[in-house]
Amino acid sequence: ISLKKGNTGMLELVESAIDMLYYNGKMGEIATKHFGSDVTEGVRTVTEEPTLDLSKLSTVEDGKLIIGFEAGYPPMEYTDDSGLEFIGFDVDLAKELGSMFGLEVEFVNTTFDGIFAGLDKGQYDMIIAAVSITPERQEAYEMTEPYISNQLVIVTKK
């Protein structure tokens, strides 16, 4: 999850919420629903119940958690067969965060090429879009610690 640089309070809150989802088993449930197995297992170890300091909540619009993502990357984020409903691991994670923070969740579907520009302009509170952590992104944005482990493979023609 990526947030604007300097939004450290919100980053701490999101980290605590993710830890809470690990602690209560919900993160594993979401992963198993979308991947068929718990791809979060072993990524984080949370042994004590985290607390959420909602005084650190900082959003673009009161009462809403606005999420930037690109709905074309199943099983992370995509649309259902009708094309009207967003579904996927990241969608369910965002909904859980919204519920924990007492906020309505709004999704902004955008192209990945422009997703960080939208965050910079304040069009959404955070990016939840299977963003890889790179040194360049860590320099420019606040980024959560990893919360999912998926394997990448290269496929070639025989």
Locate the predicted segments by residue.
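A bilobed periplasmic-binding-protein/Venus flytrap-type ligand-binding module shared by bacterial periplasmic
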Residues: I1-A17, L152-K158
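Ligand-binding "clamshell"
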Residues: I1-K5, E41, D53, Q123, ...
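Soluble non-cytosolic domains of exported or imported proteins
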Residues: K4-E12, L21-G25, L84-D92, N109-D113, ...
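Solvent-exposed coil/turn segments that connect beta secondary-structure elements
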Residues: K5-G6, F35, E70-Y73, D81, ...
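Extracytoplasmic/secreted cell-surface and envelope-processing proteins
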Residues: L11, E77, F116-A117, E136-Q138
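Ligand-binding clefts/hinges and TM-proximal coupling segments of bilobed small-molecule sensing domains
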Residues: E15-S58
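Extracytoplasmic small-molecule ligand-binding "clamshell" domains
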Residues: E29, D53-L54, V60-V131
